[in-house]
């Protein structure tokens, strides 16, 4: 998720992702797949009760070409998991997926995992952009074996040693990146490759692409 951020970004995004289109993929959107980010007082991420928050002074957000991006993903063979559950077989491994639309925007409607199969899957994977506690709780209750998420940027601006100050959701900043465990379920939260285009800086939180190997 959060793939676009700018109205003109789609061609560049597809060029960057092109090598990955050779592999099977699933996707879910984040808020910056729908709406362009806005310039805000950065202290709002630390103190949500700022005067600007209370007054609701934000301008109307700019809509991004979300449908066009998703159509391009579909044409390259990836599968959207936008409040959707489905089963895929990848290299002989049967995977049940459950994905939700962006929890940060409260667009999430959990579909559970596929139930219309006689044989169980080899693994059940939950996918969400923002790792809100309600989302992780639901995946755990539905029987996920592992959950993948992003959104937090790993804190983006961290203390020495990588300790995040904020998570931009209700997850404790101390566990807002990397492989954590929630209600007995492994959750991998990528700190991502980018940053807000209005705050193009990372401090003690380098860009990251994650390769996770699942084993029996």
Predicted regions and their residues:
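Core catalytic region of metal-dependent phosphoesterases/phosphodiesterases
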Residues: 1-89
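Short, hinge-like loop/turn segments at secondary-structure boundaries
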Residues: 43-47, 115, 165-167
């Amino acid at each position: 998720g959060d793939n676009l951020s700018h109205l003109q970004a789609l061609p560049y995004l597809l060029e960057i992702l092109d090598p990955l289109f050779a592999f099977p993929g699933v996707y879910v959107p984040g808020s910056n797949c729908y709406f362009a980010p806005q310039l805000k007082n950065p202290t709002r991420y630390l103190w949500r009760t700022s005067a600007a928050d209370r007054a609701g002074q934000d301008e109307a957000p700019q809509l991004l070409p979300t449908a066009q991006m998703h159509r391009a993903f579909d044409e390259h063979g990836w599968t959207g998991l936008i409040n959707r559950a489905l089963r895929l077989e990848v290299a002989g491994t049967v995977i049940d997926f459950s994905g939700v639309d962006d929890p940060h925007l409260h667009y999430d409607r959990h579909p559970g995992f596929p139930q219309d199969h006689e044989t169980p899957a080899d693994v059940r994977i939950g996918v969400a952009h923002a790792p809100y506690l309600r989302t992780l709780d639901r995946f755990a209750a539905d029987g996920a074996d592992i959950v993948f998420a992003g959104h937090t940027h790993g804190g983006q601006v961290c203390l020495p040693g990588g300790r995040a100050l904020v998570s931009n959701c209700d997850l404790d900043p101390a566990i807002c990146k990397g492989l954590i465990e929630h209600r007995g379920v492994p959750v991998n939260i990528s700190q991502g490759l980018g940053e807000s285009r209005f705050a193009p800086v990372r401090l003690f939180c380098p860009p990251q692409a994650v390769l996770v190997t699942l084993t029996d």
